[in-house]
Amino acid sequence: LTTLIPPKVASASNLGSNPAAKRMQHIVSFYSKLPRGEASFPKAKSPLGLYREKYFDTGSGAPLLHASLFFLAVGYGLEYYFHLSHHKEH
């Protein structure tokens, strides 16, 4: 008969007690060891981390404005450079 029953079910320690209660006790002991309260996050030190903390974590729309201004400035710079190179050729 013991060859048909898996070893975990047929163990002597589980025969006299409720296995569900033992499993629940393991879960309770695991969760009781976890820290409680607010999680503390390390402060950002890099410029990108500070930017993310200031604008992205607060849900601000400023990064969209910053990105559009950046692309506008880069586009203007490229147009100006290639316009000057066009004048050198002619």
Swiss-Prot record:
UniProt keyword annotations, A-Z: ATP synthesis, CF(0), Hydrogen ion transport, Ion transport, Membrane, Mitochondrion, Mitochondrion inner membrane, Transport
Keyword Transport: yes
Signal peptide: none
Protein name: ATP synthase subunit f, mitochondrial
Record GO cellular component, one term: proton-transporting ATP synthase complex
Pfam families reported for this sequence: F1F0-ATPsyn_F
Stated role: Mitochondrial membrane ATP synthase (F(1)F(0) ATP synthase or Complex V) produces ATP from ADP in the presence of a proton gradient across the membrane which is generated by electron transport complexes of the respiratory chain. F-type ATP synthases consist of two structural domains, F(1) - containing the extramembraneous catalytic core, and F(0) - containing the membrane proton channel, linked together by a central stalk and a peripheral stalk.
Gene Ontology MF term list: proton-transporting ATP synthase activity, rotational mechanism
Subunit structure as annotated in this protein's UniProt entry: F-type ATP synthases have 2 components, the catalytic core F(1) and the membrane-embedded component F(0), linked together by a central stalk and a peripheral stalk. The central stalk, also called rotor shaft, is often seen as part of F(1). The peripheral stalk is seen as part of F(0). F(0) contains the membrane channel next to the rotor. F-type ATP synthases form dimers but each monomer functions independently in ATP generation.
Localization in the cell: Mitochondrion inner membrane
Gene name for this UniProt entry: ATP17
InterPro entries, sorted: ATP_synth_F0_fsu_mt_fun
Top-rank lineage group of the source organism: Eukaryota
Record family assignment: Belongs to the ATPase F chain family.
Record bears the keyword Membrane: yes
Source organism per UniProt: Pichia angusta
